[in-house]
């Protein structure tokens, strides 16, 4: 993990298209600004982890739905 020290108003760049700026610090909270391309999704970690879990659950449900649907079709016999 790269660890950097920045003061309010200072920024850092990730590649050519992402800029992170420290906007302010109050106690234990840091306010940051992100400049990212419009097509890039940005999530807070707790939201991102929740989305991943919901996607995982949806895939598991879809797998069981596919298996249930497959049981509805008669098995082919070799003729």
UniProtKB/Swiss-Prot annotation:
Which superkingdom, per the lineage? Answer: Bacteria
- Pfam families with a match to the protein in the record: CsrA
Q: Where in the cell is it found?
A: Cytoplasm
Q: Name one GO molecular function term.
A: mRNA 5'-UTR binding
Q: Does the keyword NADP apply?
A: no
Q: Name one GO biological process term.
A: bacterial-type flagellum organization
Task: Recite the UniProt keywords alphabetically.
Answer: Bacterial flagellum biogenesis, Cytoplasm, Repressor, RNA-binding, Translation regulation
Give me the Gene Ontology terms describing cellular component: cytosol
Its assembly, as annotated, is: Homodimer; the beta-strands of each monomer intercalate to form a hydrophobic core, while the alpha-helices form wings that extend away from the core.
Name the PANTHER family on file: CARBON STORAGE REGULATOR
Q: What does this protein do?
A: A translational regulator that binds mRNA to regulate translation initiation and/or mRNA stability. Usually binds in the 5'-UTR at or near the Shine-Dalgarno sequence preventing ribosome-binding, thus repressing translation. Its main target seems to be the major flagellin gene, while its function is anatagonized by FliW.
- Into which family does the record put it? Belongs to the CsrA/RsmA family.
Matching entries from NCBIfam families are given as: csrA, PRK01712.1
Name this protein carries in UniProt = Translational regulator CsrA
Species assigned in the record:
Solidesulfovibrio magneticus (strain ATCC 700980 / DSM 13731 / RS-1) (Desulfovibrio magneticus)
């Amino acid at each position: 993990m790269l660890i950097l020290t920045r003061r309010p108003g200072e920024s850092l760049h990730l590649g050519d298209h992402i800029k992170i700026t420290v906007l302010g610090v109050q106690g234990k909270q840091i306010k940051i600004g992100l400049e990212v391309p419009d097509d890039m999704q940005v999530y807070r970690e707790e939201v991102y982890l929740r989305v991943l879990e919901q996607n995982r659950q949806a895939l598991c449900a879809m797998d069981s739905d596919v298996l249930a649907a497959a049981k509805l079709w008669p098995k082919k016999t070799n003729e």
